[in-house]
A protein has these predicted regions:
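Bacterial N-terminal signal peptides
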Residues: 1-8
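Scaffold/interface architecture of coatomer-like assemblies
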Residues: 12-253
């Protein structure tokens, strides 16, 4: 499935006249920064500065597939969290819910496949939770299994990241745990999204609300025309206090 989707996203001999990036800019309080122009941005690839032709507000209408797995909260907290998240999206946005039937890596690929089939212009995968595993039990009986505990994503992380990038899908996540989730954080960073690891469930609702606001206040940067698209460039702004995240953007997926 992974290889087939990658092949579909990168047809042989395809040429792209211009390159577009989807960029998030946040202040030191985590709030989106509005009103930026091309002069505010610097884009470099392999140390060479690229020309920014235009900066426009991205469409605030998004299509989110929310995946639930191992989230350490009550049903009431989850319902409230979803309400805050959806309430910060525009009225035309779509949020579909997806559970994990097998492995989490498979669920993410299935979400990518679903978004690709719908040809949405602003596709998002949001993971609420994380992978899980059976903790070893100190009891020797074969009838006793350890409890489930939070765990990082396993599988071919680089290939999943490449698939998300090929389809210009942002990956976000929120997990309530003290377990390191380096692979999930890496996956989000590669796409221009972000994976939040929070220590307490009482911060879940506010974190989800911030993600919703972020999705509705992003930029599309158009770069100078090129006969081919190279490695993902580095995007920065003049103010060092601002946080910048960037990923690929395409009008079709």
């Amino acid at each position: 499935m992974l290889c087939a989707l990658l092949a579909a996203a990168s047809p042989a001999g395809a040429r792209q006249a211009s390159e577009m990036l989807l960029v998030t800019v946040l202040d030191d309080a985590g709030a989106p920064v509005a009103g930026l122009t091309p002069d505010h941005f610097t884009v470099r690839r392999n140390g060479v500065e690229l020309e920014v032709l235009s900066v426009e507000a991205a469409s605030s209408t998004v299509h989110v597939i929310a995946i639930f797995e191992g989230l350490a909260v009550t049903q009431r907290q989850l319902t409230s969290t979803l309400s805050r998240f959806i309430g910060n999206l525009d009225d035309d946005s779509i949020v579909d819910m997806q559970s994990v039937e097998s492995g989490l890596d498979t669920a993410i690929v299935e979400a990518i496949e679903d978004l690709h089939a719908r040809s949405t212009s602003r596709p998002i995968v949001l993971l609420l939770g994380q992978a899980s595993e059976i903790a070893p039990s100190s009891l020797q009986s074969s009838q006793v299994r350890g409890r489930r505990r939070a765990a990082d994503l396993t599988g071919n992380i680089d290939q999943i990241a490449a698939l998300l990038q090929e389809h210009s899908i942002l990956f976000y996540g929120i997990s309530v745990t003290d377990v390191p989730l380096n692979n999930l954080e890496h996956l989000a960073d590669k796409t221009g999204g972000h994976f939040h690891v929070i220590a307490a469930s009482d911060a879940l609702e506010e974190t989800a609300a911030h993600v919703g606001l972020e999705l509705g206040a992003q930029y599309v940067l158009s770069l100078s025309a090129s006969s081919s698209i190279g490695p993902m460039p580095q995007v920065s702004v003049r103010d060092p206090r601002l946080t910048v995240r960037a990923g690929r953007h395409a009008s079709e997926h």
